[in-house]
């Protein structure tokens, strides 16, 4: 079978939900009083949108092959990402065979090294990479998970991230991850409120349901240690992203400090095999959570996962819907997946990237069989307005 080449690369921007899931209307739990690195400033404490968490918007990358097949993917990156795709990265794709993903990733990464390495540049490369996998799988008429070696389990099981773990239990999830509400700047009273919230939820869900705390890079080692020790009484399974992502030394110390049996997790805002190598070799965590739309895409996540496996560390990708489902179902060291509750009150199961994607699967009773539709199995919603701010 002769493989087509890449004819066109296009980048679009979307506002209002989608891959930039913080871009929500007022009243959404994800923008409520949540501990952040900016919570040290009272004026930015009540809402994450107040300090601009949603300024980027969604980036949509579309790649068309010479036979007319179109692959696409979505990530966070907005207009900045669209500029990088159109003005820089497209040259490394157009004219290449759709199979040459490793070469294209290498050229995208090393050509942007002087202004990239992490952040929005890696988000953008990740979006392109995911679109390439979607395209290749569609050309081969099979789901992405088959390109990754095939499934190692019949179905995925999920924990839910959201403000209502008690409702998540009723919906069949195996655990619930709460956003930590009060930051170190709110002192001992804030710490007490954090523990009280955990205790309240433990009382609602019983002893066998997992409970975790997502700290979103907002703590220091001293506070995180106090939180972990106080939370141990209430069966906290893991403490997540407690420290800024570059504080590898702090994570290693925190992991030594937490009570026996409690896990330390991080990696949502880490990128590439080199970043995760630091986390793994320094013994920073028990579980890594790369976001496939931010860490370098599927191509890089395969390498990150292999490193983690060699260190006996679990890989549970952050959110990212179908892009992580197709990966997790193929890996023994990814025993479960995250589902981000995107209903404003976390009281129902809705697709993570709603309303941007159609045919996006959701767990039923906390479980899912990954569809065998070619590619990642989703379509863009034609009712969502795409803007193409740049062309090449």
From Swiss-Prot:
PROSITE patterns, A to Z: MR_MLE_1 (PS00908)
Catalytic activity: L-rhamnonate = 2-dehydro-3-deoxy-L-rhamnonate + H2O
InterPro entries for this protein: Enolase-like_C_sf, Enolase-like_N, Enolase_C-like, L-Rhamnon_dehydrat, Mandel_Rmase/mucon_lact_enz_CS, Mandelate_racemase_C, Mandelate_racemase_N_dom, RHMD-like
Site (Transition state stabilizer): 338
Binding note for cofactor: Binds 1 Mg(2+) ion per subunit.
Superkingdom classification of source: Bacteria
GO terms, molecular function: L-rhamnonate dehydratase activity; magnesium ion binding
Enzyme class: lyase
Catalytic center residues: 318
Keyword Lipoprotein among record annotations: no
Binding site for Mg(2+): 214, 240, 268
More about this protein: Reaction proceeds via a syn dehydration.
Assembly description: Homooctamer; tetramer of dimers.
Family affiliation: Belongs to the mandelate racemase/muconate lactonizing enzyme family. RhamD subfamily.
NCBIfam families registered for this protein in UniProt: PRK15440.1
Name used for this protein in its record: L-rhamnonate dehydratase
Lineage: Bacteria, Pseudomonadati, Pseudomonadota, Betaproteobacteria, Burkholderiales
